[in-house]
Amino acid sequence: MKLNTKHHGTIDYEEKDIINFKRGLPGFEHLKKFIVYSIEENNIFSVLQSLEEENIGIPVLSPFTICSDYEVKLTEEQIKNLKIKSEEEVWVLNTVTINSDYKEITTNLRAPIIINIKERIGEQIILKNEEYKIKYPIFQEENKC
């Protein structure tokens, strides 16, 4: 299947690539089906792309690329909702706010997107750990999360 994206042209994807968000995402509750694709020539950022609205693509990254000790503690209810059986089924992404000044590019460490890669379902959650910033600068000299 093909999808025309706003910023990255045509993306090929398969049915098995679709991630279902039962409740959508905050601000996009009406959107339920997404794919994640890598940005060419960039090994940090990916895009969480809506299949229902081609103009909606959210930059994301793995928090572990900038914060090796990042920790997500899911509640029993979240584990149940996402049908998680093991850590190996979990993919964690964080949204990114892009800025023309690279020093101002931030990620939201407080509200990760949790994806069960086996069941292809996802949910954005809010962590209780207030040490994780909502606007954490990605490109800083010291990465202390």
UniProtKB/Swiss-Prot annotation:
What domain of life?
Bacteria
What keywords is this UniProt entry annotated with?
A: Bacterial flagellum biogenesis, Chaperone, Cytoplasm, Translation regulation
Q: Which NCBIfam families match?
A: PRK13285.1-1 (NF009793)
What is the name of the protein in this document? Answer: Flagellar assembly factor FliW
Where is it found, in Gene Ontology cellular component terms? Answer: cytoplasm
Family to which the UniProt record says this protein belongs: Belongs to the FliW family.
Pfam families membership = FliW (PF02623)
Species whose genome carries this gene? Clostridium tetani (strain Massachusetts / E88)
Q: Where in the cell is it found?
A: Cytoplasm
What main location does UniProt list? cytoplasm
SUPFAM superfamilies named in the record: BH3618-like (SSF141457)
How it assembles, according to the record, is: Interacts with translational regulator CsrA and flagellin(s).
In the record, biological process GO terms are: bacterial-type flagellum assembly; regulation of translation
Function description: Acts as an anti-CsrA protein, binds CsrA and prevents it from repressing translation of its target genes, one of which is flagellin. Binds to flagellin and participates in the assembly of the flagellum.
